[in-house]
């Protein structure tokens, strides 16, 4: 994009956890084959990062040279959202696609679309 900047709500300090959809699909298949209990199982990556870190990572992945403008007049939202994934890990499942790699894959796919 030739845009000079991208506006982002909040000041970038809110922390979020992100999981690639391929990892989610694999986790659901894993649970269908390996879990029969009725207790809830969280599926996630167990790591979080700030919205600022996410924006900077996306900026690098897509080669955006403009500014990231964080607008603190908009809400940050919940300070932190991260799941306890110890149960699914103890069953033997772990995510395999790191966030940066997943972002790169999705961007490459998107760029290849007409």
Describe the role of every protein-language-model region.
Residues 1-114:
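C-terminal substrate-binding subdomain of Rossmann-fold SDR/epimerase-dehydratase oxidoreductases
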């Amino acid at each position: 994009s030739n845009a000079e900047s991208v506006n982002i709500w909040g000041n970038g300090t809110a922390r979020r956890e992100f999981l690639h959809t391929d990892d989610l699909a694999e986790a659901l298949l894993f649970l269908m084959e390996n879990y029969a209990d009725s207790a809830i199982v969280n599926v996630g990556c167990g790591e979080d990062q700030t919205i600022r870190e996410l924006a900077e990572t996306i900026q690098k992945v897509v080669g955006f040279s403009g500014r990231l403008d964080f607008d603190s007049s908009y809400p940050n939202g919940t300070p932190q959202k991260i799941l306890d994934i110890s149960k699914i890990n103890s069953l033997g499942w772990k995510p395999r696609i790191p966030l940066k790699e997943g972002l790169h894959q999705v961007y490459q796919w998107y760029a290849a679309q007409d």
